[in-house]
């Protein structure tokens, strides 16, 4: 009798486990979608001005708001100042998923 009870509990736990994993993967995908403002336009505005090395500044901002795999590819960015202390970063050779 104990064996049957243990078997049933194990079956119930294993049936709940995969559904819990799929919900976790789904929420992780939503977080990644929120962190990816760069695609498809590959342009992003920020509330600051371009520094002396604006291209590096844009790349640092890209890395902080994008997937860490960006570091594995060669990305070059262009920084352009806009009125009211805004800057536009354009990274045209960035690979979008």
Curated annotation (Swiss-Prot):
One Pfam family here: SCRL
Tissues where this protein is expressed: Flower buds and stems.
Signal sequence segment: 1-24
GO cellular component assignments: extracellular region
Gene Ontology biological-process annotations: defense response to fungus; killing of cells of another organism; signal transduction
This protein's UniProt keywords: Antimicrobial, Disulfide bond, Fungicide, Plant defense, Secreted, Signal
Record flagged with keyword Lipid biosynthesis: no
Family, per entry: Belongs to the DEFL family.
Protein's UniProt name: Defensin-like protein 246
Record lineage: Eukaryota, Viridiplantae, Streptophyta, Embryophyta, Tracheophyta
Gene that produces this protein: SCRL5
């Amino acid at each position: 009798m104990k064996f049957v009870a243990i078997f049933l509990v194990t079956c119930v736990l294993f049936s709940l486990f995969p559904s819990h994993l799929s919900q976790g993967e789904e929420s992780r995908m939503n977080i990644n979608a929120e962190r990816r403002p760069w695609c498809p336009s590959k342009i992003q505005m920020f509330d600051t001005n371009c520094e002396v090395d604006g291209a590096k500044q844009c790349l640092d901002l890209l890395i902080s708001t994008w997937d860490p795999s960006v570091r594995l590819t060669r990305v070059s960015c262009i920084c352009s100042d806009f009125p009211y202390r805004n800057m536009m970063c354009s990274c045209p050779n960035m690979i979008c998923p």
